[in-house]
């Protein structure tokens, strides 16, 4: 990728990540507003989950179109690691060196923006990823959850149904399920940029725990998922035929 194209890709990543953190962080408030409008009782958690999953589906569909329109922009750094390990893409080191910081900066902007824009009655719904256990347990949880969701996303996108609506519903349901599974451990994030944005807001972005739990282990989980997907689900590359003498 030429330098100009790489810079444009990094700028697109920053914009998309900003918008993703801004919108995704508002899902809790949006769910509360919708359930309140529908008159759903506060204890009916399954209805709230249905609303959240539906809203997330709309968000994923919208961002899929947006990322495509911007030439393949991404709002999650682990996408590159998973795609590389799966043999689906091979980004240059220069590209990664520009796009990772751009995504982190976009996430910081998104987290700061939603913190300012969120109405007072919904401020309590703003809860970014936070470590609720010891660092080693949190790192293991974040790595395992990232592995699970990455493998699921790869399968749905590459091998899953061709119907866009069904594909989006599978993705949103999987994401919500994994978030529920990791809620008592790390938040969870499964997106280092998103975690960094909220860590910056809460002033613990420059700690070892943040790097260890929300960057190193998710990358390990994503790369392992990509490698397993490549071995299990993708056909091996054809061997070149040798000419007989």
From Swiss-Prot:
Belongs to the MIP/aquaporin (TC 1.A.8) family. SIP (TC 1.A.8.10) subfamily. A motif (NPA 2) lies at residues 191-193. A motif (NPA 1) lies at residues 76-78. It holds the Pfam family MIP. The gene is SIP1-1. It is a multi-pass membrane protein. It is found in: Membrane. Aquaporins contain two tandem repeats each containing three membrane-spanning domains and a pore-forming loop with the signature motif Asn-Pro-Ala (NPA). The lineage of its organism: Eukaryota, Viridiplantae, Streptophyta, Embryophyta, Tracheophyta. Keywords: Membrane, Repeat, Transmembrane, Transmembrane helix, Transport. One of its GO terms (cellular component) is membrane. The keyword Transmembrane helix applies. Aquaporins facilitate the transport of water and small neutral solutes across cell membranes. Gene3D superfamilies: Glycerol uptake facilitator protein. One of its GO terms (molecular function) is water channel activity. This is Aquaporin SIP1-1. The chain crosses the membrane at residues 14-34, 55-75, 100-120, 138-158, 164-184, 213-233.
């Amino acid at each position: 990728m030429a330098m100009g194209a790489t810079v444009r890709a990094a700028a697109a990543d920053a914009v998309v990540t900003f918008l993703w953190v801004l919108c995704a962080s508002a899902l809790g408030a949006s769910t509360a507003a919708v359930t309140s409008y529908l008159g759903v009782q506060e204890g009916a958690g399954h209805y709230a989950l249905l609303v959240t999953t539906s809203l997330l589906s709309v968000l994923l569909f919208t961002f899929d179109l947006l990322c495509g329109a911007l030439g393949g922009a991404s709002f999650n750094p682990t996408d590159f690691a998973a795609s590389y390990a799966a043999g689906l893409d091979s980004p240059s080191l220069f590209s990664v060196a520009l796009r990772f910081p751009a995504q982190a900066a976009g996430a910081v902007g998104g987290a700061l923006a939603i913190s300012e824009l969120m109405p007072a009655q919904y401020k309590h719904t703003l809860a970014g990823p936070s470590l609720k256990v010891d660092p080693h347990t949190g790192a293991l949880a974040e790595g395992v959850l990232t592995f699970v969701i990455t493998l699921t996303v790869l399968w749905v996108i590459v091998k899953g149904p061709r119907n866009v609506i069904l594909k989006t519903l599978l993705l949103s349901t999987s994401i919500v399920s994994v978030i529920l599974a990791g809620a008592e451990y790390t938040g969870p994030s499964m997106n280092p940029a998103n975690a960094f944005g909220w860590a910056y807001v809460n002033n613990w972005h420059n700690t070892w725990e943040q790097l260890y739990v929300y960057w190193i282990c998710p990358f390990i989980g994503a790369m392992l998922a990509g490698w397993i997907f490549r071995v299990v689900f993708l056909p091996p590359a054809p061997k070149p035929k040798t000419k007989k003498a």
